[in-house]
UniProtKB/Swiss-Prot annotation:
GO cellular component: cytoplasm
HAMAP family: 16SrRNA_methyltr_H (MF_01007)
Pfam families to which the protein is assigned, alphabetical: Methyltransf_5
Binding site for S-adenosyl-L-methionine: A33, G34, H35, D53, Y83, D100, Q107
DNA damage keyword on record: no
EC number: 2.1.1.199
Record-given protein name: Ribosomal RNA small subunit methyltransferase H
Length: 310
């Protein structure tokens, strides 16, 4: 299957990075290189792009798309290793870092990867297929309490308790092996009236399991902090999120970097001596335009936040 993915907030991201032609830029989520192809177009031969992706299919597709550019370095790794990878590459400072935290259209639409609740496939959901831990292990080995926690916390699913109970009850008879088996169990757990309203009944549970498989939330804050250490003065970091859990982490981490003072509010002057490392470029998140929403409905929930290194 061809790796297709429509880049979200493309113009907004390029503007956010404030690209210098001889700068060094990092795309933490290279994907099909939609954003990166626009970044590298703006670089001279002295500029450089470092592209991370833990999905080998994505790296292969990006390599094909960017084959005419000799100043691109491809890294098969999760972006949480950004500091160590850049250090190993001999890079002390970069001028821009981009993170697009959405699952690519390719991964969602490619049924065999197990991300989709619309197509039957083995329970997988691994971004990096070299990892052994998959959705199958979560669904078939987590306790009812653990399932409830992740579905409630990561899926923000109000029927999390019933869904966890139904999963455990069903797997007593036989292991749950495919996405559509799981979908039917989720549907059975959710009252009929609720199933008829809102998004697909399995959407929130699938999101929760995917986040747990790939440890998506655990690594965001660390990556931001490590990335900022590598940003040159005036360098920008731009992050696109797609749900409230991610956005909250990005917003709060940016806020702490921009206003790290821990002194009580009644203190007349700061005595903790913690200085801001960044400034917020966008106090409110940038969202998709009406035009973008028309041709790319998946951009509806996208939010872009930007900081600049001081």
């Amino acid at each position: 299957m061809e790796f297709k993915h429509v880049s979200v907030l493309l113009d907004e991201c390029i503007n956010a990075l404030n690209i210098k032609e001889d700068g060094i830029y990092v795309d933490c989520t290279l994907g099909g290189a939609g954003h990166s192809s626009e970044i590298v177009k703006r670089l001279s031969s002295d500029g450089r792009l470092i592209g991370f992706d833990q999905d080998k299919d994505a790296l292969k597709a990006a390599g094909e798309r960017l084959k005419d550019y000799k100043n691109v370095t491809y890294v098969h790794s999760n972006f949480y290793a950004i500091y160590d990878v850049l250090t190993d590459l001999g890079i002390d400072g970069v001028d821009g870092i981009l993170m697009d935290l959405g699952v690519s259209s390719y991964q969602l639409d490619n049924g065999e990867r197990g991300f989709s609740y619309m197509q039957d496939a083995p329970l997988d959901m691994r971004m990096n297929r070299e990892n052994e831990f998959s959705a199958y292990e979560i669904v078939n080995t987590y306790s009812e309490e653990e399932l409830y926690r992740i579905i409630k916390e990561y899926g923000e699913e109000k029927f999390a308790k019933r869904i966890a109970s139904f999963i455990v009850k069903n797997r007593e008879e036989k292991n749950i092996e495919t996405t559509l088996e799981l979908v039917e169990i989720i549907k059975a757990a959710i009252p009929a009236k609720a199933r008829r309203e809102g998004p697909h009944p399995a959407k929130r549970t699938f999101q929760a399991i995917r986040i747990e498989v790939n440890k998506e939330l655990e690594i965001i804050s660390k990556t931001i902090l490590d990335g900022v250490k590598k940003l040159n003065k005036g360098g920008r970091m731009a992050i696109i999120t797609f749900h409230s859990l991610e956005d909250r982490i990005v917003k709060n981490t940016f806020k702490e970097l921009a206003n790290p003072c821990t002194c009580p509010s009644e203190f007349p002057v700061c005595v903790c001596n913690r200085k801001p490392e960044v400034k917020l470029i966008s106090r409110k998140p940038i969202e998709a335009s009406k035009e973008e929403l028309e041709f790319n409905p998946r951009s509806r929930s996208a939010k872009l936040r930007i900081i600049e290194k001081l």
